[in-house]
Curated annotation (Swiss-Prot):
GO CC field: plasma membrane; vesicle
Highest taxon above the source species: Eukaryota
Keyword annotations: Disulfide bond, Eye lens protein, Glycoprotein, Membrane, Phosphoprotein, Transmembrane, Transmembrane helix
Designated name of the protein: Lens fiber membrane intrinsic protein
Keyword rRNA-binding (UniProt): no
Subcellular location: Membrane
Species assigned in the record: Rattus norvegicus
């Protein structure tokens, strides 16, 4: 059980760090504009060496930002529950901390999937046609890696929960 929780905690830490870095950085998309390279993130866009805040309130950016922030919050609360699961006493039979941590990591996975799906759909259908020579960049890719890490953290914690439940049910009372 503890090895599953340890693996889940490792995946959760890495996934949460990647979520925060992906959300905060400006390299979701790179493109060429007026002969010079440019890149943009969820909060700023940069032309050459100058960066500007994205002040326009565009729905897909707002949705992507919100889902990325929700994902990071769920992953952080999952880490807290996951750490507390190591100290779980047998008196807490109603609320299983490994199960709760797993649910939080799956919620984080869902939110980051929604954020990346929205960003991908709008970028490919609208921005990709507008800029011509463009590509997704490393911040965007970190988001996909974070999705995998939070998903596997959820899997590990659900396996730990299942293993604990099987042991609890098999011991005589």
């Amino acid at each position: 059980m503890y090895s599953f929780m340890g693996g889940g905690l490792f995946c959760a830490w890495v996934g949460t760090i990647l979520l925060v870095v992906a959300t905060a950085t400006d390299h979701w998309m790179q493109y060429r504009l007026s002969g010079s390279f440019a890149h943009q993130g969820l909060w700023r866009y940069c032309l050459g060496n100058k960066c500007f805040l994205q002040t326009e309130s565009i729905a897909y950016w707002n949705a992507t930002r919100a889902f990325m922030i929700l994902s990071a919050l769920c992953a952080t609360s999952g880490i807290i529950m996951g750490v507390l699961a190591f100290a779980q006493q047998s008196t807490f039979t109603r609320l299983s901390r490994p199960f709760s941590a797993g649910i939080m990591f799956f919620a984080s996975t869902l939110f980051v999937l929604l954020a990346l799906a929205i960003y991908t759909g709008v970028t490919v259908s609208f921005l990709g046609r507008r800029f011509g020579d463009w590509r997704f960049s490393w911040s965007y890719i970190l988001g996909w890696v974070a999705l995998l890490m939070t998903f596997f953290a959820g899997i590990f914690y659900m396996c730990a929960y299942r293993m604990h439940e099987c042991r609890r049910l098999s011991t005589p009372r």
